[in-house]
């Protein structure tokens, strides 16, 4: 018999109730009691949606900020700087206070989690949220399966203090548990807490618990599997049925995974075909339940239900204990497609957000049982999802005609560099910014007024021009060498281009949580991508008309647009990336023809889109590098910049070099310039590097001395002729009164540095 189950339904609410509750609480507009009551209502709303569609309902899913933070608090891993745990006050201090935990990407998704810091080895069951939530639903007559982040994944994503030497002095740094010894030590310390948790749930009548273990799809060592066996052997002794959920990729070792001592195993059968291949070829244990994640939890497309029913029929031949489910948590999707009334024609019927995915899970089971409504849906979904949609013959022709030369600049870097230096005549240590300037309240208000039709397009454009003029005046007064227009017309670096490109749709209500209460609306790449008209030309050329200094053209790169959007599944990602790249190349050509000499193509998502297993990296980086090269195939005299605002380059430096830009700007302030070592170790590095000398995430105004120290560090390992000076990221979230003195200090520091090395200013 087939059962139905879903997990990870978005907590945001159809009208972003979660966001409003949190932010009103933080602003002091509602009490803690009102916050809790509102969260309980959201929790019940989610549970009722589950009940309408699936038989197995999860609990302990509605975190007040982040599920990894919840687990950190649950096991009592409160760093000493936060003092005694004082309920929600400490909880939110750990999440968003002055000394908050580090925030980083959750695997290769666009969700962010708070990194646990394991200071000591004394842990305890501090807050038993899984038990509280189970009891909450039990009192309402709803039987649930508690969900908990698995101990192995929790440890793999945690950091602990480690003693290292820096310039001959002992220093304590936080590092991942990257050795067998460190992992074993903390497993031993935390396993009793997890056992106590299971005991408490068992005493309340819980007979099944699911542990989320996405770390099992990453590259694992043999000792990792030994530790996993130890964890689940111990936990299974409690006498509660255990399930392990894996997602985002195939499990790294099928044989070891299916032999773990648990009752149920969840497989992502969407991200690739390896899990399914292993299940069919190697079989599946008769005494275990196979949870088949066949409904895509990461992409918003309606399922071809005929294909899914057929797949389940195949799986039933392998396992009689079958559960149909989603491939990964549904919180990567908006709540529902229902209110979307401005999508391109024919698109809405092809979409399925979280609410619709729950219904699809139910329909698959009902179709297997031969129910008429479900069978009609099977037919309808197949008809819609197999029809040709949003194809552009001209885009296809351009793709088909691409050859190797389209992925190469006309001249090698060293020859381009000479030409560009002659044209730009920039001083040593040229100064610039990354692109955006403060988006103040008046900018947001005018954008909203324009979007809602309260002001005309002409009024809005005139307002943007005033802002650009002010930004140019400020930069000239400060003395920056290469200027930017400020990006006042852009609310989001991907959405801005998505709106202007054919083949990409934006939603009105398709909000997804990124972290805490922060939401975004991913664009949807639904068809062949092309550029019907120039996208940035008007603003950039206006800015350039106001100054004799070079103004950078500012584009978001093809890899980032793809990785931060939902994308179609009927063509390979490589092809989508090349389509976007060709559209951007058209923009580059227009900017060049308008006299723009410096063009920046930002790729912040270049690394984060990489597959979770390194064996899959060569294929990904091959098309990622080529997409950038295709978009940036400018004239030799045009200086191409790129920007990457993360600091872990070690593993991908070779791929970064292959991108063949002229200048790359990087974050260097938070790592105090340590990132420079990566470029030092790379033999033959000859590209220019913009050193991010101050942390834009802090309101503090950096001193000349602090910034100079980072530059001096860089000068020890890189030729001074290669170095630029810039902040580490865009200045959109800062205030003008912070930005102006910081940039003034930065420019003054660069001038002093030129004098110190004997160059006339």
From Swiss-Prot:
Protein name in the entry: 5-methyltetrahydropteroyltriglutamate--homocysteine methyltransferase
Organism lineage string: Bacteria, Pseudomonadati, Aquificota, Aquificia, Aquificales
Listed cofactors: Zn(2+)
One protein family per Pfam: Meth_synt_2
Pathway(s) this gene product operates in, as recorded in its UniProt entry: Amino-acid biosynthesis; L-methionine biosynthesis via de novo pathway; L-methionine from L-homocysteine (MetE route): step 1/1
Active-site residues annotated for this sequence: 697
Cofactor annotation comment: Binds 1 zinc ion per subunit.
The EC number(s) this enzyme carries: 2.1.1.14
Gene that produces this protein: metE
Entry's Gene Ontology BP terms: methionine biosynthetic process; methylation
Family: Belongs to the vitamin-B12 independent methionine synthase family.
Binding site for L-methionine: 434-436, 487, 602
Described purpose of this protein according to its UniProt entry: Catalyzes the transfer of a methyl group from 5-methyltetrahydrofolate to homocysteine resulting in methionine formation.
HAMAP family (UniProt xref): Meth_synth
Entry-linked PANTHER family: 5-METHYLTETRAHYDROPTEROYLTRIGLUTAMATE--HOMOCYSTEINE METHYLTRANSFERASE (PTHR30519)
Classification via InterPro entries: Cbl-indep_Met_Synth_N, Cobalamin-indep_Met_synthase, Met_Synth_C/arc, UROD/MetE-like_sf
Residues where 5-methyltetrahydropteroyltri-L-glutamate binds: 16-19, 105, 564, 608
Catalytic activity from the UniProt record: 5-methyltetrahydropteroyltri-L-glutamate + L-homocysteine = tetrahydropteroyltri-L-glutamate + L-methionine
Gene Ontology molecular functions: 5-methyltetrahydropteroyltriglutamate-homocysteine S-methyltransferase activity; zinc ion binding
Binding site for Zn(2+): 643, 645, 667, 729
């Amino acid at each position: 018999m087939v059962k139905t189950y879903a997990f990870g339904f978005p907590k945001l609410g159809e009208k972003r109730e979660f966001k409003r509750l949190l932010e009103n609480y933080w602003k002091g507009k509602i009490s803690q009691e009102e916050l809790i009551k509102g969260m309980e209502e959201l929790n019940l709303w989610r549970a009722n949606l589950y009940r309408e569609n699936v038989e197995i309902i999860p609990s302990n899913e509605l975190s007040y900020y982040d599920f990894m933070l919840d687990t950190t608090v649950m096991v009592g891993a409160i760093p000493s700087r936060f003092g005694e745990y004082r309920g929600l006050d400490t909880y939110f201090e750990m999440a968003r206070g002055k000394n908050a935990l580090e925030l980083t990407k959750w695997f290769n998704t666009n969700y962010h989690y708070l990194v646990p810091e394991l200071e000591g080895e004394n842990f305890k069951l501090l807050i038993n949220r899984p038990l509280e939530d189970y009891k909450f639903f039990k009192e309402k007559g709803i039987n649930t399966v508690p969900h908990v982040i698995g101990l192995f994944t929790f440890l793999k994503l945690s950091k602990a203090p480690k003693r290292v030497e820096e310039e001959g002095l002992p220093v304590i740094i936080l590092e991942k548990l990257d050795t067998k010894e460190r992992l074993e030590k903390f497993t031993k310390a935390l396993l009793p807490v997890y056992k106590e948790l299971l005991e408490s749930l068992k005493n309340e009548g819980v007979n099944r618990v699911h542990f989320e273990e996405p770390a099992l799809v990453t590259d694992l060592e043999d000792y990792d599997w030994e530790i996993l066996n130890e964890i689940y052997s111990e936990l299974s002794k409690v006498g509660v049925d255990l399930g392990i959920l894996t997602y985002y990729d195939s499990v790294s070792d099928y044989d070891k995974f299916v032999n773990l001592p648990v009752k149920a195993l969840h497989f992502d059968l969407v991200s690739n075909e390896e899990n399914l291949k292993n299940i069919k070829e190697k079989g599946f244990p008769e005494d275990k339940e196979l949870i088949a994640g066949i409904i895509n939890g990461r992409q918003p497309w309606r399922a071809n239900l005929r294909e899914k029913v057929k797949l389940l029929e195949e799986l039933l031949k392998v396992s009689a204990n079958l559960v149909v489910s989603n491939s990964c948590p549904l919180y990567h999707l908006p709540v529902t497609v229902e209110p979307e009334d401005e999508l391109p024609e024919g698109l809405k019927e092809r979409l399925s957000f979280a609410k619709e995915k729950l219904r699809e899970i139910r329909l698959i089971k009902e179709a297997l049982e031969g129910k008429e409504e479900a069978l009609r849906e099977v037919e309808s979904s197949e008809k819609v999802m197999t029809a040709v949609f949003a194809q552009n013959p001209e885009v296809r022709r351009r793709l088909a005609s691409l050859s190797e030369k389209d992925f190469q600049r006309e001249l090698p870097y060293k020859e381009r560099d000479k030409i560009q230096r002659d044209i730009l005549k920039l001083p040593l240590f040229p100064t610039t910014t990354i692109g955006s300037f403060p988006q103040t309240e008046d900018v947001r208000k005018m954008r909203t007024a324009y979007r809602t039709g309260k002001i005309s397009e002409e009024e809005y454009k005139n307002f943007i021009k005033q802002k650009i003029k002010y930004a140019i005046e400020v930069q000239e007064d400060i003395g920056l060498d290469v200027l930017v227009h400020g990006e006042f017309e852009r609310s989001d670096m991907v959405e801005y281009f998505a709106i202007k490109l054919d083949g990409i749709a934006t939603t009105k209500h398709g909000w997804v949580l990124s972290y805490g209460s922060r939401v975004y609306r991913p664009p949807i790449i639904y068809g062949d991508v092309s550029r019907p008209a120039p996208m940035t030309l008007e603003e950039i050329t206006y800015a350039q008309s106001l100054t004799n200094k070079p103004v950078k053209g500012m584009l978001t790169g093809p890899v980032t647009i793809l990785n931060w959007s939902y994308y179609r599944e009927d063509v390979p990602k490589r092809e989508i990336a090349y389509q976007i790249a060709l559209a951007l190349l058209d923009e580059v050509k227009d900017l060049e023809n308008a006299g723009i000499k410096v063009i920046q193509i930002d790729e912040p998502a270049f690394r984060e889109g990489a597959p979770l297993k390194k064996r899959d990296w060569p294929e990904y980086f091959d098309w990622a590098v080529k997409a950038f090269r295709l978009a940036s195939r400018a004239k030799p005299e045009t200086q191409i910049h790129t920007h990457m605002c993360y600091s872990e380059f070690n593993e991908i430096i070779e791929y970064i070099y292959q991108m063949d830009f002229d200048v790359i700007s990087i974050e260097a302030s938070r790592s105090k310039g340590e990132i420079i070592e990566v470029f030092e170790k790379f033999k033959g590095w000859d590209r220019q590097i913009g050193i991010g000398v101050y942390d834009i995430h802090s309101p503090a105004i950096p001193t000349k001395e602090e910034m100079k120290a980072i530059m001096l560090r860089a000068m020890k390992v890189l030729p001074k002729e290669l170095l630029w000076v810039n902040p580490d990221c865009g200045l959109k979230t800062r205030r003008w009164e912070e930005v102006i003195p910081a940039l003034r200090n930065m420019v003054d520091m660069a001038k002093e540095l030129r004098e110190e090395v004997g160059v006339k200013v």
